[in-house]
A protein has these predicted regions:
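Short catalytic micro-motifs in class I SAM-dependent methyltransferases
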Residues: 100-105
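A SAM-dependent methyltransferase catalytic signature shared across enzymes that methylate proteins
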Residues: 154-172
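A C-terminal cap/extension of S-adenosyl-L-methionine-dependent methyltransferases
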Residues: 166-207
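Acidic carboxylate diad motif detector
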Residues: 128-130
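Conserved N-terminal segment of class I S-adenosyl-L-methionine
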Residues: 1-92, 96-98, 109-116, 169-171, ...
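A short glycine-rich, Lys/Arg-flanked "PGG" loop and its adjoining helix->strand segment in the class I
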Residues: 112-126
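Acceptor-substrate binding/catalytic loop of class I
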Residues: 137-152, 156
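Short catalytic/ligand-binding loop motif for oxyanion handling, primarily in non-cytosolic enzymes
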Residues: 46-47, 134-139, 175-176
């Protein structure tokens, strides 16, 4: 992850809006969970949605300003301000790890340690989303430092001895789906991962 805290980027993350695709994903994959970890929780954007679906919600992020904002949502039982690779020494295991738009911020050398730590923390499911680098929006944020193809990342995830992962599309964001001329594109983006601007890697525990 980039060294230090970029305060302009922090401000941008504080201004982010809820993505309905993520709320629907939480409703589907977190519902009924005893506990969930919001990995790279940022400002707590999805804390309330996680709280509606899980009995216990904890978060971890490395940015102190974002952690304070997440705490202010009141959705989390606990927030830890630390790199995600330290989750094992900071928090108890959870049923589900929700990891939305985090991995792209890690350099290649940080990816496996972070994944190992998060997988060790999850007893049942890993719910990971990342931008599809075939789309321009994935390149607009200078902190998106991980270079990956969708197939390469799936293979990297499936090096795990704990989880088996599948790659799934999420479709277009709501503000694009409302445009009539995007409807055929959304139909493709909901069926085929390579056509989806954001993709899901869903991990089920196997060992």
């Amino acid at each position: 992850m980039a060294e230090g805290i970029d305060h302009e980027l922090t401000r941008r993350y504080l201004d982010r809006q809820v993505d309905g695709r993520m709320v629907a994903l939480i409703d589907r994959e977190v519902a009924g969970a005893a506990s969930v970890l919001d990995a790279g929780c940022g400002s707590g954007l999805y804390g309330p949605a996680l709280r509606r679906r899980a009995a216990t919600v904890v978060g971890i992020d490395h940015d102190p300003a974002l952690c304070r904002q997440a705490e202010a949502t009141g959705a989390y039982n606990r927030i830890v301000c630390a790199p995600v690779a330290e989750v094992g020494s900071r928090l108890d295991p959870v049923e589900v790890v929700f990891c939305s738009e985090l991995l792209e911020h890690l350099v290649r050398e940080e990816l496996r340690p972070a994944l190992d730590a998060l997988e060790a923390a999850a007893t049942a499911r890993m719910v990971i989303t990342v931008p599809n680098r075939l789309f321009p929006h994935a390149h607009l944020d200078p902190t998106h430092v991980l270079r990956y193809r969708l197939g390469w990342l799936l293979a990297e995830l499936n090096r795990s001895r704990r989880f088996a992962y599948s790659l799934q599309p999420l479709g277009l964001a709501e503000h694009w789906r409302r445009r009539w001329w995007c409807r055929p594109l959304d139909a493709a983006a909901r069926r085929v991962a390579v056509c989806s601007p954001t993709v899901l890697y869903l991990g089920r525990r196997v060992g």
